[in-house]
Amino acid sequence: MPNPLIPANRSSEKYQRILDAAVAVFAEKGFFVSRISDIADRADVADGTVYLYFKNKDEILASAINTAFDGFMIRARTELEKLSSPTQRLRRLAYLHLEALGANRNMAVVFQMELRQSTRSLAEFSHQHLVEYFNLVRQAISDGKTSGEFRPEMPEKIAANCFFGAIDEMVTSWVLSEKDYPLAHAADPLVDILLNGMRPATR
């Protein structure tokens, strides 16, 4: 049953301000030690205002991740629909993934580190949202097998896991690095290695 105290309209500026503040606080302090009061202070609202929008800290984390991911998926689907080549679709998806998190280090920290410390939140996110991402990858791989761009015997599930895993590790390495380099620049070489392996190009 919906909480009658939580506003139906979550598109307000104050709602987004609380989400942005939460991402910053979670990234700086860590999810488990962060308090609602920390988020309220960062958002410049009263503690009670946060509770008008969210029941607890877990719901704030889920809402922040889901809102960001939904926006990413809308852009990804829109851009990939313009590309007929499976290879180009994978390249573009890798670029968009790295670009999105590379542009927001706080969100990258929350997604790579804090979300994964909450088993429940990670399971819910994977079940509800990550499957959409993998569907885009597996569709590109399937189309590539059909068109002859990719090996027909290649297992799609394993290939999709390798694709996501490689990008995911690039983001984690960037988050942990003290160097602030353009993360999206890794997209092309990463996809080249995935598609072509380490063998020299044939002449």
Positions of PLM-derived features:
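Basic, helix-initiating cap at the start of DNA-binding domains
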Residues: 1-29, 34-42, 59
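Base-recognition residues in the alpha-helical recognition helix of bacterial helix-turn-helix
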Residues: 27, 51-55, 67, 113
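Amphipathic C-terminal alpha-helical segment
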Residues: 99-103, 134, 139, 143, ...
